[in-house]
C-alpha cells in the first residue's frame, strides 16, 4: 500500500470509518489526509490539514459523522483540536477546521471554541452521555491534555471543561498545588 506522495512519510494518525470500513490516515510532515479503500485497493487524497509539520492523532465519532484531529506536537507550541465532518451523500470528509483551542498559542483555560486553551491534546475517546439522550449528538469527547497534566472533556457544543487533574501551564515536573503533605 502506497502511503502518500511526500518523500518523508510517517503515518501519525489513523482511524477506520465505522460505516464504510475505509481507513483514513494523516502523514507527516505535510498533513495530507488519505483514504484507503480495502475493496478497490485504492488510496485517495481527501483533504489537507490547514497546518503542516504537526503530529496529529485522529479519533472518529462512533456514528462516523465526524472525526477529531488532535494536535499533539508541533514546533510552534500551539494547542487545538480540529474536526472533519463526514458527508454521507458525497461519501467524503470536509477540510479540517479548528473547534477547540487555537493555532496561534497554547495554555490552560476552560471555555468554548477558541476561548479554550489546550497544551498538547493527545489521546481521546468518545463517551455516551445519558444527559444528551435524544439529542443529535449524544457523546462527549474525553481527551488527555498532556502538557497541562489533566483529562478534559469536549462537549458536542464545543465547550472544553477539565474533568480530572489541574493544568499548571508549565512543563515543570511536580504538583500544581505544591509538594505533597508528609
Regions found by a protein language model. Give the residues of each.
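Hydrophobic core register within WD40 beta-propeller blades
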Residues: 14, 58, 124-125
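A short loop-to-beta-strand structural motif that recurs across blades of beta-propeller domains
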Residues: 31-34, 79-82, 149-152, 159
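Gly/Pro-rich loop segments of beta-rich domains
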Residues: 1-12, 40-54, 91-122, 159-182
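Structural signal for glycine-centered tight turns and loop->strand junctions in beta-sheet-rich domains
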Residues: 20-21, 42, 64-66, 122, ...
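Intrinsically disordered, low-complexity Ser/Thr- and acidic-rich flexible linkers and loops
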Residues: 75-76, 130-138
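Conserved beta-strand positions in repeat-built beta-propeller and related beta-rich domains
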Residues: 17, 23-29, 61, 67-77, ...
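Short loop/turn segments immediately following beta-strands, especially the blade-tip
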Residues: 38, 83-91
Amino acid at each position: 500500500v502506497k502511503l502518500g506522495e511526500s518523500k518523508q512519510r510517517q503515518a501519525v494518525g489513523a482511524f477506520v470509518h465505522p460505516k464504510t470500513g475505509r481507513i483514513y490516515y494523516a502523514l507527516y510532515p505535510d498533513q495530507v489526509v488519505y483514504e484507503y479503500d480495502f475493496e478497490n485497493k485504492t488510496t485517495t487524497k481527501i483533504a489537507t490539514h490547514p497546518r503542516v509539520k504537526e503530529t496529529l492523532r485522529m479519533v472518529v465519532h462512533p456514528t462516523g459523522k465526524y472525526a477529531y484531529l488532535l494536535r499533539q506536537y508541533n514546533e510552534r507550541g500551539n494547542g487545538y483540536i480540529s474536526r472533519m465532518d463526514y458527508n454521507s451523500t458525497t461519501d467524503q470528509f470536509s477540510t479540517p477546521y479548528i473547534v477547540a483551542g487555537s493555532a496561534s498559542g497554547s495554555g490552560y483555560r476552560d471555555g468554548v471554541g477558541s476561548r479554550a486553551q489546550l497544551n498538547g491534546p493527545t489521546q481521546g475517546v468518545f463517551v455516551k452521555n445519558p444527559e444528551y439522550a435524544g439529542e443529535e449528538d449524544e457523546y462527549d469527547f474525553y481527551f488527555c491534555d498532556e502538557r497541562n497534566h489533566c483529562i478534559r472533556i469536549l462537549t458536542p457544543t464545543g465547550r472544553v471543561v477539565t474533568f480530572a487533574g489541574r493544568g499548571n501551564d508549565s512543563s515543570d515536573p511536580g504538583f500544581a498545588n505544591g509538594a505533597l503533605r508528609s
